From Swiss-Prot:
Protein induction: By salt stress.
Gene3D superfamilies linked to this entry: Phosphorylase Kinase, domain 1 (3.30.200.20), Transferase(Phosphotransferase) domain 1 (1.10.510.10)
Record-listed ATP binding positions: 26-34, 49
Protein species of origin: Blastobotrys adeninivorans (Yeast)
Organism classification: Eukaryota, Fungi, Dikarya, Ascomycota, Saccharomycotina
Post-translational modification Phosphotyrosine, affected residues: 173
Residues with the Phosphothreonine modification: 171
Chain ranges of the Protein kinase domain: 20-299
Annotated protein name in UniProt: Mitogen-activated protein kinase hog1
Length: 400
């Protein structure tokens, strides 16, 4: 049986196996506290997320089970990877994943991003979403703080605690307001993978302008400022509104015409504006999907269809409608953890034997490039709890 060590972090007891040392707080994720640590077995830095009181209610137990199942199933270069999981003697659950140096929120609040970084980050976000959506999963909470980045500009989407089945009748109040798709505000029930594309579009716009595009104070103000830019929703979208109060609110809005995004982003690459126009569309049925967005001319320097994989099978959501007691969820959780430890070593071995796909060239330099045609790059963070800093000057190059 593994030895456990107790440490107090921000007044919270972290009870982890002795394999992990040098704990430092990173921040709060969805329903959990995250710390960085060093894995003595691999000598790699990792992130450890404590799921607080996972068995206190059936709802929390089910949510934790869902996140574990998703982390086990979703394996992609642009998604956070689960490397270990354990239940402590106090019956808290800990997810161990790779540690990246910073997140997109920290980068955006530190300085403007240069064009090639915006382009490469958006490509990786959409590459990850293409895979997630192909598995029948909707992230539902895509935002800059859920997009992790290392010093080599490798990007990974994290925090699948709110992810749900790909289902047009999903319900609930989800996603951070600034990045929330209008169909969520209009109906709160009928939405699908397109909500992630809207969120990615809002993130794309924020990278281009350096601040949120739709900083709503509440959901009414949020929807109002969306219409100030995109105009009133078309009639066929209004017809889908299920709530009478929401319908009356939308009809009461003043008549507004769509403003071309080229006016909002006068200095942006025309291809970037064109792609953004296709992502920020009121009607989710007409919104571009992840696969088509990857093929857009704006992302041509990185687009490689053979290196943009989809899931080999759909995620099994058969448990999602189950209404089970905590003890049953606990047994199911233990079963999943045992299964993870039984199969993970063979999966890693198999992955190591497979040839790695070609990656965009990212070079570590101590000084900016000397060629005049290559602009100086922003430095990426090396520490997860510090503002963006360090000696890295990554050079982003198109695929050869």
């Amino acid at each position: 049986m593994a030895d456990f060590i107790r440490t107090q972090i921000f007044g919270t007891c972290f009870e982890i196996t002795s394999r992990y040392v040098d704990l430092n707080p990173v921040g709060m994720g969805a329903f959990g506290l995250v710390c960085s640590a060093r894995d003595q077995l691999t000598n790699q830095n990792v992130a450890i997320k404590k799921i607080m009181k996972p068995f206190s209610t059936p709802v929390l137990a089910k949510r934790t089970y869902r996140e574990l199942k998703l982390l086990k199933h979703l394996r992609h270069e642009n998604l956070i990877t689960l490397s270990d999981i354990f239940i402590s003697p106090l019956e808290d659950i800990y997810f161990v994943t790779e540690l990246l140096g910073t997140d997109l929120h920290r980068l955006l609040t530190s300085r403007p991003l240069e064009h090639q970084f915006i382009q490469y980050f958006l490509y990786q976000i959409l590459r990850g979403l293409k895979y997630v959506h192909s598995a029948g999963v909707v992230h539902r909470d895509l935002k800059p703080s859920n997009i992790l980045i290392n010093e080599n500009c490798d990007l990974k989407i994290c925090d699948f605690g709110l992810a749900r089945i790909q289902d047009p009748q999903m319900t609930g109040y989800v996603s951070t307001r600034y990045y929330r798709a209008p169909e969520i505000m209009l109906t709160w029930q009928k939405y699908d993978v397109e909500v992630d594309i809207w969120s990615a579009g809002c993130i794309f716009a924020e990278m281009l302008r350096g601040k949120p595009l739709f900083p709503g104070k509440d959901h009414v103000h949020q929807f109002s400022i969306i219409t100030e830019l995109l105009g009133n929703p078309p009639d066929d979208v209004i017809e889908t509104i299920g709530s009478e109060n929401t319908l009356n609110f939308v009809k009461s809005l003043p008549k507004r015409e769509r403003i071309p995004l080229s006016q909002k982003f006068p200095n942006a690459d025309p291809d970037a504006v064109d792609l953004l126009e296709k992502m920020l569309v009121f009607d989710p049925r007409k919104r571009i999907n992840a696969a088509d967005a990857l093929a857009h001319p704006y992302l041509a320097p990185y687009h490689e269809p053979s290196d943009e994989p989809v899931a080999s099978e759909k995620f099994d959501w058969s448990f999602n409608d189950a209404d089970l007691p905590v003890d049953t969820w606990k047994v199911m959780m233990y079963s999943e953890i045992l299964d993870f430890h039984n199969v993970d070593s063979s999966a890693v071995e198999q992955q190591q034997q497979q040839p790695q796909p070609p990656q965009p060239q990212l070079q570590q330099q101590q000084q900016p490039p000397q060629q005049p045609q290559q602009p100086q790059q922003p430095q990426x963070a090396q520490q997860p709890v510090q503002p963006v800093q360090g000696d890295y000057v990554p050079q982003v190059a198109p695929r050869s």
